[in-house]
Amino acid sequence: MEHLLSIFVKSVFIENMALSFFLGMCTFLAVSKKVSTAFGLGIAVIVVLGIAVPVNQLVYTHILKDGVLVDGVDLSFLNFITFIGVIAALVQILEMILDKFFPALYSALGIFLPLITVNCAIFGGVSFMVQREYDLVESVVYGIGAGTGWMLAIVALAGLTEKMKYSDVPAGLRGLGITFITVGLMALGFMSFSGIQL
């Protein structure tokens, strides 16, 4: 149990997808204007990572890994295309669910919901799972933790962006300029967690 808690805390704070690895920056910067929209996208990322990482772990372990299906046959060269296919299918299912049950959130996310399919934070989570050789339970914990860390970062950035609307930001820094500075300062803050040994 302590090992699983360690994986979760590391994936949320120490190895944050957005602020340590800078993965998923396209949607991270574009959807961080309002806290409500950022929160909705964060939940979507948690759901996709929480399902995609363990499903891809099963696919990798039982189909693609060297010698699993047939001795001497290594299908790991199909990792990328298989992982992307599984992620795309999960995002399509999530998109249909949001359209049916949460139409306001679906329209607020707009084009960025299908972009989760090619979001490098999602693919990075799956790739890190393979690289670190997590089992199924560890994959579930890691997927949910990585999604939670990404959501924490985007909601914090959205909150800061909403506060900056009322600030006197110099004309040359308005928009993406001040956002990049803010993300850099947030990343520096999250670097303080890197000294924690779990």
Swiss-Prot record:
Gene Ontology biological process terms, A to Z: respiratory electron transport chain; sodium ion transport
Species in which this protein is naturally found: Haemophilus ducreyi (strain 35000HP / ATCC 700724)
PANTHER family: INTEGRAL MEMBRANE PROTEIN OF SOXR-REDUCING COMPLEX, NA(+)-TRANSLOCATING NADH-QUINONE REDUCTASE SUBUNIT E
Enzyme class: translocase
Protein's recorded name: Na(+)-translocating NADH-quinone reductase subunit E
Subcellular location: Cell inner membrane
Membrane topology term: Multi-pass membrane protein
GO cellular component: Gram-negative-bacterium-type cell wall; plasma membrane
InterPro entries in alphabetical order: NqrDE/RnfAE, NqrDE/RnfAE_oxidrdctase, NqrE
